[in-house]
Amino acid sequence: MAYTNQISAVVFLAVAIAPLLAEPQSTMFPEMTPECATVMPDLLEKCFATGSVTPTEDCCTDLKSATSTQVTCLCDNYIANPAVSNITGPYSKAITTKCGVFDKYSCDGTSKGGEEKKGGSSSSNGKDNGKSEGNGGRANSVAASMAMFGLLASLVFVMF
């Protein structure tokens, strides 16, 4: 009889937690406009694909002449999402600082790139360290659900 109760409790918990795990997950790649997808590869190749923190003249010229749309595209889709590309905050900061456009490209993935900052230079690394990256904390949600399931299942087994 106790074994039947344990099975029933485990099945109940599995059915109760399953809808939480079935929520659609966000995509790894951010949404990108067609303009962003066609314009950015050239700039990315000139500036960030070399692996060097010393930018070329062509790179600096392109960074200085970039429109606000291009800045927003670079910030939101590449700098703020290192999972998509290898452009990390410190690497981006090194290149944009040497080109003299750090204030223009100091962004955090919130479509605010290209806005001039008021009052002095920024010491930001180009990322918001308080945010989770990639999946918006979905992995933590799954881990918490599984931990709760394990806790409840062990309590049920101890009781019966």
Swiss-Prot record:
Chief location of this protein within or outside the cell: membrane
Keyword Glycoprotein belongs to the record: yes
Signal peptide: 1-22
GO cellular component: plasma membrane; side of membrane
Localization, UniProt: Cell membrane
Chain positions listed as propeptide in the UniProt record: 136-160
Keyword annotations of the record: Cell membrane, Disulfide bond, Glycoprotein, GPI-anchor, Lipoprotein, Membrane, Signal
Membrane topology classification: Lipid-anchor; GPI-anchor
Residues that carry a glycan: N86
UniProt region (Disordered), positions on chain: 111-136
Residues where lipid is bound covalently (GPI-anchor amidated asparagine): N135
Pfam families registered for this protein in UniProt: LTP_2 (PF14368)
Keyword Thylakoid (UniProt): no
Cystine crosslinks: C36-C75, C47-C59, C60-C99, C73-C107
Domain of life, per lineage: Eukaryota
Record-stated family: Belongs to the plant LTP family.
Protein role: Probable lipid transfer protein.
The protein's name: Non-specific lipid transfer protein GPI-anchored 28
